[in-house]
Amino acid sequence: MTDTPQLDAQMAFLNEACKLKQVDRQSALQDLSRPENSAEHSWHVALYALVMDIPELSDPADRSKAIKMILLHDLVEIDAGDHPIHLDHDADAVAQAEAAAATRLFGLLPADQAAEMRTLWDEFEAGSTAAARGAKRMDHVQPMLQAAAPAVPLPDHVQVVEDNLAQGRARNLHIDWPEMFAHVRAALDTTPAPTGDVAKRIAFLNECDRLKPVYRATYISGGSRFENSAEHSWHLALYALVLAEHAPHPINVDRVITMLLLHDLVEIDAGDHPIFGDYDASAKEAEELEAARRIFGLLPDAQGAEMLAIWQEFEANETPDAVFAKSLDRFQAPNQNLASNGGSWAKYNVTYDTFREKVGGKIGYGAPILLDWVTPRVKAFLDAMPR
């Protein structure tokens, strides 16, 4: 059994991180069907940092660092909760609670990674570097566009945005990012927005919000509800950040994270297809390619082509980056099933042999160490599962 303290600690952190999916925010999905949670919010903000073009993120290294900060920035809400900007809070008390949460959560990791992740989180909080300022800008802009996007926005949410623009943390948006200010203002005023690349990126990001109501067969840890594909994508990007050392071949972790942020966007059109379910693989492949072309086609031409190429690389499963990303995609679900009293395994009457046939080989192809770690845990559970 692969049972190293390093991997045990990493998985303890990743399983604990799943709790962020249960932290609801004041903001709502753009279809107004339910509150947005902090995990899918983090995924959406990471997409903002991936596609938006601002001076702070002009250096690819700063963009990559900003995305990592965004993946981590709200984890403290697992312990400290979300604090809506329009409500009064004791800022010192919140800062202390969040710092204590960061100490506990990152402390679950091996010491070297704990220090690395805590440094990223502290840098984001301080907002003193280009990467941190860029990450914070995305974190500030996403909720405003989120509130203004519905056909009939919620009046109280609109008022929060108006107050934010007038005297809150976005009060200098008209100076710092005038083009984005013009788009937010147009959305609030229901007047024609400026055209151009920013408009196309906003259209893409608004479309991405539709992944949040796409639910998977897998439960979140604890089994209280099904996981949606947006929060799943955030969790996988976090898996990549934490588990990159276990790739059997050299990888570019930033590209792996990008693949995992993008990989399930096609489910907006094509839906989720459970690995233990029955479906026509050829029809699924064609439907997903059509979806990818439509969704990435919302972006400016060159950027859309780049994102489509990354998605196609992931699907082809041939490069070291794609192979590791695919293996992580298969590795996450068994861990959540183990943390959910079997989760989807009971529904599909999964046996250990079924797991080996449908999942095990796919994990082992790109992450044999992870397969060695999870296999005895899965076998023990499935062999004992009532049928």
Where are these regions (language model features)?
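Alpha-helical, largely C-terminal catalytic domains
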Residues: 1-387
